[in-house]
């Protein structure tokens, strides 16, 4: 056996190295992202000193009395703790003590976080000094307006009660809006009614990485309505270390940050691989989020390929209020229709009509059909072979996970692959070391047409 360069696993729960070995005849290619070195202290200071389209935070915060800092939760890999000491210093320069700062964790519908989540996210020192609140989307929300799309905006009451709202978030591929980050941080502090309407009221970007969509436009409106004044945007490398930082007016810098992510994390489709390995780090905290964000390369694996998913699932199944793990495609349809009816009643006939059209096209063969490489990918997606789920740590998960089979050792994975491949000694192996961050793209295939329709939209 020859060792592969080490992967990472267990985001927020150890962030440890994971060495893997392969038989000598296997041709292993690891598709590492092209990211710059981790940020230095001086680079972080400079980012705070030169925000985009705004005064420095120390000036923006002058004369403020109730500042609020919104941070994403542990389902996102954003290392807020790396910049938190510098942020607190900006507030100190404005005459604001840490004890006067409220930190609100934007949990969306993900449920209440574990007791140590805030210390993991912002660092133990900041957690000990600041006032901490975990958002509850079913309580403590107030209505502050309505968007031009007709959605009522319910938000955590701490937001309108504050006189300066600063966010810390990241920029990651996202199924509904193309990319997360920017105004999408606001979604995490909204009430359940607003979140439901957003998810069921818009057509998903469908994994196309296109941020020019109505879901994103409405989020932009909502961020303005709730008063998201300033944003600290971080981009990470495959080891969850921050490598790029932008501060200031998110509307001014967001598209540039997305362009950077698309280029730095661009990776090819596994067109001719015999084995495709997808590492769900750094969004491997739970099964709920790993199953949608970590499987993209596997969805596009060739029919004959063995598919391996690596995920720590440190918090077990996890939770999403709109897209729970227990739902399956057929059982999920009435629930989706009901929620869509609550969000936008006019959507239900469109949903039914769309499903009928898709069934007719499938049965008659009519309608536009993909050609060339796109057709190849669509055919490959029909593979029925299971995904081998490698769990580096012992965690409690359901015995049955649709489409997956759990394997608790790496030698066990190699045995399954060898059996899959009928004992072939020479195999082409493609490894995606941080698949939730990686942007699958080619110069000839339309990403939107390759979006896996069966993916759950957990975000």
Identify the residue ranges that each predicted region occupies.
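N-terminal amphipathic/basic leader segments beginning at the initiator methionine
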Residues: 1-48
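Short glycine-rich or small-residue beta-strand-to-loop segments that form or flank ligand, phosphate
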Residues: 66-77, 102-107, 276-279
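An acidic, phosphate/nucleotide-engaging active-site surface
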Residues: 113-179
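Internal metal/ion-chelating core segments
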Residues: 161-243
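Membrane-embedded hairpin module used as a gating/binding unit in multi-pass transport
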Residues: 209-285
């Amino acid at each position: 056996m020859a060792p592969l360069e080490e992967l990472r696993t267990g985001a927020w729960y150890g962030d440890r190295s994971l060495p893997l070995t392969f038989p000598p005849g296997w041709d292993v290619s690891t598709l590492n992202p092209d990211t710059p070195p981790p940020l230095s202290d001086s680079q972080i200071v400079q980012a705070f000193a030169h925000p985009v389209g705004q005064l420095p935070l120390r000036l923006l915060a002058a004369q403020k009395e109730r500042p609020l800092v919104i941070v994403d939760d542990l389902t996102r890999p954003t290392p807020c703790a790396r910049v938190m000491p510098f942020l607190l210093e900006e507030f100190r320069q404005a005459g604001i003590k840490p004890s006067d700062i409220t930190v609100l964790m934007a949990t969306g519908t993900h449920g209440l976080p574990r007791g140590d989540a805030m210390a993991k996210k912002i660092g133990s020192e900041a957690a000990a000094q600041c006032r901490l609140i975990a958002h509850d989307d079913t309580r403590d929300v107030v209505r502050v307006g309505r968007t031009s799309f007709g959605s009522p905006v319910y938000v955590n009451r701490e937001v309108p009660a504050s006189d300066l709202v600063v966010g810390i978030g990241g920029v990651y591929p996202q199924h509904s809006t193309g990319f997360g980050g920017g105004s999408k941080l606001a979604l995490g502090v909204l009430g359940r009614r607003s979140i439901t309407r957003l998810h069921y009221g818009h057509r998903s970007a469908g994994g196309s990485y296109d941020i020019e969509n109505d879901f994103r436009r409405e989020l932009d409106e909502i961020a303005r309505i709730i008063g998201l004044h300033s944003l600290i945007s971080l981009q990470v490398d495959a080891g969850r270390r921050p490598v790029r930082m932008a501060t200031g007016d998110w509307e001014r810098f967001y598209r540039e940050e997305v362009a950077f992510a698309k280029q730095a994390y661009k990776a090819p489709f596994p067109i001719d691989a015999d084995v495709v390995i997808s590492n769900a780090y750094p969004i491997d905290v739970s099964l709920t989020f790993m199953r949608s964000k970590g499987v993209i390369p596997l969805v596009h694996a060739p029919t004959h390929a063995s598919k391996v998913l690596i995920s720590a699932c440190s918090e077990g199944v996890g939770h999403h209020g709109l897209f729970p793990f227990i739902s399956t495609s057929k059982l999920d349809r009435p629930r989706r229709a009901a929620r869509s009816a609550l969000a936008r009643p006019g959507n239900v006939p469109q949903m039914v009509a769309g499903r009928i059209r898709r069934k007719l096209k499938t049965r008659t063969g009519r309608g536009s059909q993909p050609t060339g490489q796109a057709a190849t990918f669509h055919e490959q997606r029909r593979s029925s072979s299971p995904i081998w789920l490698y769990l580096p740590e012992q965690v409690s998960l359901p015995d049955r996970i649709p489409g997956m089979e759990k394997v608790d050792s790496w030698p066990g994975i190699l045995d399954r692959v060898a059996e899959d491949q009928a004992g072939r000694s020479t195999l082409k192996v493609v490894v995606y070391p941080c698949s939730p961050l990686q942007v699958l793209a080619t110069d000839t295939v339309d990403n939107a047409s390759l979006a896996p329709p069966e993916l759950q939209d957990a975000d």
